[in-house]
Amino acid sequence: MTHLIDLAELGSVGGFFALREGPGGPGSVPFADVYAPPPAARDPLGFRVGKVERGLRAPEVRVAASVAQLGLAARLWSVALGSAALYGAVPDLDAALLRWDPDGASPDDLWLTDVRPLPGDARTVRRVVADGHLEPLAAALRARYRISAGLLRGNAGSALAGAARELHAWAVREGREDVGERGLAMAAELFGHPGLRGTGTLDGAAFRRRSCCLYYRCPNGGVCGDCCFERPPSRSSHRASSG
């Protein structure tokens, strides 16, 4: 397959769609290290969760773990879905090729050492993102933090829907409605897979999830636009829809 993916154009969709080619900065690590058990000297996943915990003043570490996972899921879905809708190809985001700076922010946090285009169908997008990253990420988080599989699945669905919605909005602004429609159609197909089925309801570009990421528990936090709650629940309801 020829090199079809224009990373500069992809990044113009929005910050979550940004991907740079190269070895990354001095703080970047391959995602294979992120999913591995924490070594004695370096722990990129724990560092990121701790950074989110401090930044949000999260009341417990599982809230920070949820928000950190949601952010990574949004980055990965956006890059893959955007590439597939724009170019009919998706970059190989193999955990040995994709590097991440746990102290960075978009667009400077993701680097791909070698851009290798793969077919841009939903099956490949799922394999690249869900099988290649979200499942090992969820396993690593659940091994270390008290966080439910259902909550993490809900975050994955929310992140996918958000990527499709942002891509669709960009496509409308740019007069490229075909790109937006391809993104929505692919998202709908991905939600039909057992891994995401039941995480929420996708209606065009609108989505309502069936679980909560727990962000509302942070000081000054509220419910997200796609949350299952209309307003932050009382403390007695904290576990009602968190997993």
Model regions and ranges:
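Phenylalanine-focused residue identity feature
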Residues: 16-17, 31, 35, 47, ...
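Hydrophobic, aromatic-lined core segments that form the binding pocket/scaffold
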Residues: 35-204
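A eukaryotic "domain-start" boundary segment
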Residues: 1-43
